[in-house]
Each structure stands twice: as C-alpha cells, then as structure tokens.
Amino acid sequence: MTDFSPREIVSELDRFIVGQTDAKRAVSIALRNRWRRQQLEGSLREEVLPKNILMIGPTGVGKTEIARRLAKLANAPFLKVEATKFTEVGYVGRDVEQIVRDLVEVAIAQVRERKRKDVQARAQLAAEERVLDALVGANASSATRESFRKKLRAGELNDKEIEIETQSSGGGMPMFEIPGMPGAQMGAISIGDIFGKLGGRSKTRRLTVESSHEILINEESDKLLDTEQLTLEAISAVENNGIVFLDEIDKICARDGRVGGDVSREGVQRDLLPLIEGTTVSTKHGAVKTDHILFIASGAFHVAKPSDLLPELQGRLPIRVELQALTRDDMRRILTEPEASLIKQYVALMQTEGVTLDITDNAIDALADVAVAVNSTVENIGARRLQTVMERVLDEISFTAPDRNGETIRVDADFVQKHVGDLAKNADLSRFIL
C-alpha cells in the first residue's frame, strides 16, 4: 500500500493529467484514507468503511486516465472494469462477482512478484545448477562443473543452446462453464485444473543459455514460495486495500420509457448493490469479503443523469466529483505539459526515422483551436480530438518519413491550416473525417 500524502499523489497525477484538481484531490484523499485505516487498532479499523466515489464529467476529460495513473501509484490490488460488460446473475454473460475474482488474481500476481524478489538469490543459484546440468550433465566432475560455472558467470556461454525441462503453463487449456456446478459460480473451470495432475505438466524446450535464465529463475522462485501463504496474503490485500474502478456506470442507467427490468442495466445495478455495500464472494482461492474494497465509479452522464441510478446505488457512492469540460487553454497544455504529451510522442517517433520535427508555438495554438472548434460543432469528445487532428496534420510526414532521413521539418500554424483548416470549417466533412 502506498504511503504517499494526498499532496504527493496529486503532484504525481499532475505529471500526466492536465487540470481536474477536484477529482485528483478526491482520489488522493480516498487513497490516503486506506493507509490511515491500516494504522488504526482492532474493532475501530473494522468500522471505518471506504467512502466510494462517483466521477461525473464529459468524455475525454481524464476520468479513465486518472484511474490508469492511480493504479500504478496505489501499489495495491487495482482493477479497472467497464460496467457495460456485465449482465444480471442468471443470464448469459459475466456477473458482477467476477470483478472480485479478477481482483484476487491481480493480487496473487502482485504478491508473487514481490515474494519472488525475496528468494531471488537462492533461485539464481538453483537455476545456475540446472543450466550446468544441461551443459555438462548431472554426473560431471566437480572440477568440470566449476570451470563451466566460471565461464557461465563471465557470460561466455550465453549464446550456447541447451535443452531444459520447463513447467507447462497450461495456457493452452480451454476454459468452460458447467451450468449448475459449484465451480461455475467461482468462474470458468479450466480443463487444466481437472486433468493437470495426470501428467504432461512439463515439456522440453531448446533455448540459449541467456534466454533460459529468466524462465528458470521464475520456476525456481515459485518452488521456494509457499503457495497457501501467498494466496492468504493476496486475499487479505484485496479485502483491505483493493480498489475497483467502474467505468461507464452511466451506460447501465435505465432507459427512459422502458417498463420492467433490464438484464444489462438495472439488473447489473441491483447486483452491484451488495458488492459495494459489503458481501462475501466465493472464489476458487477462498471467500473474499468486499466490505473494505474502495469503488470508484465514473460516467459521462451526457444522456442519463446521476439521479437515474438506483437510489440505493447513489447512496453507496457518497462522494461526487464533477470533472470540467476542457477549455482551449487546457487543450494547449495537454499538447505540451504531460511527461508523455502528444507533441513529445510524435517528435520521438519521427526521430526513429532520422526526421526532426520542429513544432512551433503557433502550430500548437492552431492545433488547440481546431480541436476546440470541431468539438463545439460536431461532438465533444474532449482531449481525444487532439489525437485525430494530430494524425491528420502529420499524415503526409508519417507516410514519407523513411525517404526524408536527415531532414528537419517545420510545422507551424500555416502548415496546420493547410492540412485541416478547410475540414474544420466544413462541419459536414469534419463530422466524418475529424
């Protein structure tokens, strides 16, 4: 769990996302409250429940990007899902309890990665022995092994091919569901789970010494790990620190004028209620309590309104944050300020071809103006419009770049107007092209 202060979390998000201070503050406080709860004692810790968040704002203003960046910062089990992917329990499709099962899998992968680092030194020695066995045989004299060990550590044998036995991952085993079987409620059953113990679990692979290194270290690390303890830690991490980001929550609001339930809308809302309030979900790794999982829901709400959600669901999302539509100044900052801004990305991409892009300040102004103009006349898709406009402006350069090695190409306001000016003015054309 991260121990960043709210101010540090906001400044970290500022590196990638322009504006939206209220949303950044809300998620930073929610994340810090997870850490604060961990410092409490006994019964009081159980009583402190997370304050779930509902982010409301037009498309393309940074809701999903905040979730993506938060996932990297959180250092906790984090899952981003679209609410539209689920159907009511009992119908064909994924039910909402799958969210918790997926979150457990994320946590197990995180804990395993962390624990592998603890046993890495021992795993490296064991992996080295397996490579030596493949090179000189298990019965070779100690002098021979030592001479090969020195060569191995010096990197002299990196390109030599060896045959090693590796564990089959079972990735090729198909998954299926058996109606009415308990396993079906716990997610799809893998044929590998049923028949995996009947042999065929390892296979011989021919690899270079260098490429076998990581595979063998991972295998030896997993042998040293206590799987049961690892699973318990992962479940505990989910129950205490888990974060679920529910995107497109507005798409499961009831449609106007529709009578009766709707299995992919109201039905999903009803199924989400106990999950957000706190329930126990069965997974193949054990039961998981959802009382302290933090839920962050987000939606554009350009057709539906937050009040169209079931009243009970609204009550379970007590913190409301409104994200502002992007202004021309925001568009300009998005092009230049973030660490991996669009301008920096395109300049770096062209440099791989030996072409230097010189994008002037007035070109950046022109790009922002075009994006704002098209958003206001066609459909407001926020910052995503910048990608469309940039692609259109640099289309010719991208196509001819391999033939222009060593050139410096100046992109100014006139260049931008020449490529997209007419399209931006013609609403009918921009509807289809921009």
From Swiss-Prot:
Q: Which gene name belongs to this protein?
A: hslU
Pfam families associated with the record: AAA, AAA_2, ClpB_D2-small
Top-rank taxon, per record: Bacteria
Q: Which family does it belong to?
A: Belongs to the ClpX chaperone family. HslU subfamily.
Q: Name the PANTHER family on file.
A: ATP-DEPENDENT CLP PROTEASE ATP-BINDING SUBUNIT CLPX-LIKE, MITOCHONDRIAL-RELATED, ATP-DEPENDENT PROTEASE ATPASE SUBUNIT HSLU
- SUPFAM superfamilies per record: P-loop containing nucleoside triphosphate hydrolases
Q: What is this protein called?
A: ATP-dependent protease ATPase subunit HslU
One Gene Ontology cellular component: HslUV protease complex
